[in-house]
Each structure stands twice: as structure tokens, then as C-alpha cells.
């Protein structure tokens, strides 16, 4: 069993593609994933990039995935340290890094800048690893 942390970018891509995750994989994310996804999809609808119906379909797809959502004190403390170490202005991305450090085998992100920034802290895997 391989445990992957996914962010909202990956969750939205999986929903868009209606991807089937291989059964031996486990998905994890910080609890903030839900709010970030909701916000990103809302913004896309406001910009006219998709319909509300499409956004709701993607939300429902992700809600149907078996993603373990975590957000405890230990995660927050490790996220704080990671954000400080990397000089980031906030801790949002650091929560994904911290969760990977604490509970996962790799972080899956579509963000090349994030992948480059964290490559010395966690293993980064391509989205194709999930299929």
C-alpha cells in the first residue's frame, strides 16, 4: 500500500478526468483540502471556465474518493516548521508537506514550483503514479 498526499490541484484534475485510483493506493490530505477545492471551483465558475453543474460534479467526485483528511496539532506544528524553513508567507502548502512527512510515502502535485521547493523534504510523485 502506497500512501499519497494530494492537493486541490490534483483532486480537481482527478475529478475532471474521472480517474480511477488504483486500489492499492491510499489518499491523504489536510482537512483544508475541502475548502480549497470549493474555493478554486467557485472561482472557475465565476470566471466562466465551467458551469456550476460541472463544479458540483467535480466536488461530488472528490467527496466520493476515499481521502483521509487530517488536521491535528502535530500536523500544524510540523507545517509551521516547514513554512518557516522554506520562507513561505503562509502555511497552506506546508500542511501538505507536513502530512507527507508524517504519514505518507509521497506528495503528488501539479505545481512544479512547489515540487521543486520541497524535493529535499519529501518525495514528490507524478499524478500518473495514482492510476
Regions found by a protein language model. Give the residues of each.
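Short, well-structured N-terminal submotif of metal-dependent ribonuclease cores
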Residues: 1-34, 44, 48-57, 130-131
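Phosphate- and divalent-cation-binding pockets in alpha/beta enzyme and binding domains
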Residues: 13-14, 36, 78, 116-117
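Acidic, PIN/NYN-like endoribonuclease modules and their adjacent C-terminal/linker elements
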Residues: 34, 99-131
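A general alpha-helix detector
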Residues: 36-41, 58-61, 78-82
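Short hydrophobic interaction/assembly module
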Residues: 49-72
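Active-site neighborhoods of divalent-metal-dependent phosphate/nucleic-acid chemistry enzymes
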Residues: 67-113
Amino acid at each position: 500500500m502506497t500512501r499519497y498526499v494530494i492537493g486541490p490541484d490534483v483532486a480537481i484534475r482527478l475529478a475532471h478526468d474521472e480517474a480511477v485510483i488504483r486500489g492499492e493506493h491510499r489518499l491523504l490530505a489536510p482537512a483544508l483540502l475541502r475548502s480549497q477545492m470549493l474555493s478554486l471551483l467557485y472561482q472557475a465558475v465565476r470566471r466562466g471556465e465551467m458551469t456550476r453543474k460541472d463544479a458540483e460534479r467535480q466536488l461530488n467526485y472528490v467527496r466520493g474518493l476515499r481521502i483521509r483528511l487530517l488536521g491535528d496539532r502535530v500536523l500544524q506544528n510540523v507545517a509551521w516548521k516547514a513554512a518557516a524553513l522554506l520562507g513561505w508567507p503562509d502555511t497552506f502548502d506546508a500542511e501538505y508537506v507536513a502530512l507527507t512527512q508524517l504519514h505518507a510515502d509521497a506528495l503528488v502535485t501539479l505545481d512544479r514550483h512547489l515540487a521543486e521547493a520541497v524535493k529535499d523534504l519529501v518525495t514528490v510523485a507524478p499524478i500518473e503514479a495514482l492510476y
